[in-house]
Amino acid sequence: MRFVVPPHLVSTALVSALALIGVEAASAQEFAGRDKLFAHSNEFLRDVIQVTDGVYVAVGFALANVILVEGDDGLLIIDTTEGMGAAREVRAEFDRISTKPVRAIIYTHSHPDHVRGSRAFVGDVEPEVYAHEKQLRENLPTAVGRAGRDGGNQFGLALPAESRPNAGIGPGLGLGGGDGYMRPTRTFSGESYSFEVAGVKVVLGYAPGETDDQLFVWLPEKRTLLPGDNFYRAFPNLYAIRGVPLRRVDHWLESLSDMIALEPEYLVPSHTRPIMGRTAVDAALTGYHAGVSSVLQQTLAG
């Protein structure tokens, strides 16, 4: 005897099967994204990495990296983390490399995770602190009110640790130990500013992008570029969901072009791990430029 299935039951079964397939596909996609996020934590394994002769970067101690450049009779520090607790830990690691006095500190920009640990690196010698002059107008070393609340939401600070493997650009935001911010003592207002500290030649280039006060640090004798937050191994933060002043993406592209033109051999961002080798650095910067450009062009095209 042949059993005939009513058409409406066939339709119901088909819809249910397709729905189940859709759920399974969505779940697979969800898990793939989760797995990528957990794997991204490898970017923030705590380490002090020697990039090239006299250049080191401390990764994974705080949301932002700290970069050390050793000179003849002193040290240069670039960016100082978001709090004195993490900065002291970095200082202890750097002391294993050199106990020369810190002669200068450079802020790549005004975000709190780059400026609040400065006092941890000061010894008997009071260092000069370099920044672009716009930082004096824009710097907010502590986040308050809505900015602080929404910033916490952006980084998932209220989530349990198992649901927050990293903050995307660092292991997490660590504000412990207090605020050690130091006001810049030397600023520049043009496109570039060159100086020498402890025998190391330094060029600061004005590079608006993630912030309007952003600069990059170029060490010409070492062919080493420190791009600040205009490059890291994550999609560029063209507009932060916490709410921030407008970020001029066209200016960001110009800044990336300026950095590419330097033809650096070493790239040491203030978030995520460094990139070594001329070919790898060029591929990273040009790929970043292409991605940002694509977003801009497609947005303008509607």
Range-by-range predicted roles:
Residues 8-22:
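Bacterial N-terminal signal peptides
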Residues 25-28:
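Boundary at the C-terminal end of the N-terminal hydrophobic targeting segment
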Residues 45-96, 216-219, 223-228:
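Conserved beta-strand hairpin/beta-sheet module of binuclear metal-dependent hydrolase folds
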